[in-house]
């Protein structure tokens, strides 16, 4: 009798007793099958029953049913996945250990789903999720696998890029301070519809009113006397529209220009009075517009000048040395260089 591994020591005796119990002696073909399966049993403890297709002799047909039943029971007893009672578990092969790493993934997914369900139960009844908190029992896979962190579904949708600025809440917004006095009604603002706030006017370029045209910014006569402006553009950090009092022209005014506040730099450079007509008190954006206005409106006044004013002009533009008269002052200054 050959020596069997410890995990299959009882298997040959079972097959022999079952075959003897049914009255069929052990045939030489059965012995050949046991001998052929010995090297396979010694390698990985997995019995392989090899049957010969070309059976010779009448003993192959005798006890065939008994041998089939015995081999089936032997396969059930020595199955690698089911442990036998009273015997140690057989060592797992490399293929089974590698397969166990993939079988853990469904369990980890189930844990993650359960943790998400628990986080949803702890949310507020209004439907707003609470602060995202990491669970203490983080599911970990076997060696070499990644670590999965469980976050609530609401926090996952609220995650944003690290480079984007956080949105300010309405409570954190500074209190709006009105530019105009509190006692003045909004109807007295004329064409400037709406109430202007200092927080909405961070700079001059952001001042945009649908009724305030670009051309109207240059059609300004003068700034009101009771509108002190802060020198923001000269170095002060505060807004230039803070603590200002706007003076709105009366509705009966014949001027069609829009009244607005200009920063101090524009008034200091003289942009509001650069193309200004002294006769009709109008300002123009372009110099060509002022020239066209002077030729069309004030041309008749210069047609018939006063003789007394013309005489005084000639006396003022006369050379004190040779008493020569000139029409222009620069002609007189050029003439005076010849006497030096």
Curated annotation (Swiss-Prot):
Compartment(s): Nucleus
Region of interest (Important for transcriptional repression activity), residue spans: 72-187
Descriptive protein name: Zinc finger protein 488
Biased composition (Basic and acidic residues): 106-125
Source organism of this protein record: Homo sapiens
GO molecular-function term, one example from the UniProt record: DNA binding
InterPro entries cross-referenced by the UniProt entry: TR-Histone_Methyltrans, Znf_C2H2_sf, Znf_C2H2_type
Keywords: DNA-binding, Metal-binding, Neurogenesis, Nucleus, Repeat, Repressor, Transcription, Transcription regulation, Zinc, Zinc-finger
Start and end residues of each stretch annotated as Disordered: 77-180
Quaternary organization: Interacts with OLIG2.
Function: Transcriptional repressor. Plays a role in oligodendrocyte differentiation, together with OLIG2. Mediates Notch signaling-activated formation of oligodendrocyte precursors. Promotes differentiation of adult neural stem progenitor cells (NSPCs) into mature oligodendrocytes and contributes to remyelination following nerve injury.
Listed PANTHER family: AGAP007109-PA, ZINC FINGER PROTEIN 488
GO cellular component, one term: nucleus
Zn finger intervals (C2H2-type): 275-302, 317-339
Sequence motif Nuclear localization signal, location on chain: 298-305
GO biological process: negative regulation of DNA-templated transcription; oligodendrocyte development; positive regulation of myelination; positive regulation of oligodendrocyte differentiation; regulation of DNA-templated transcription
Stretches with biased composition (Pro residues): 82-91
Family: Belongs to the krueppel C2H2-type zinc-finger protein family.
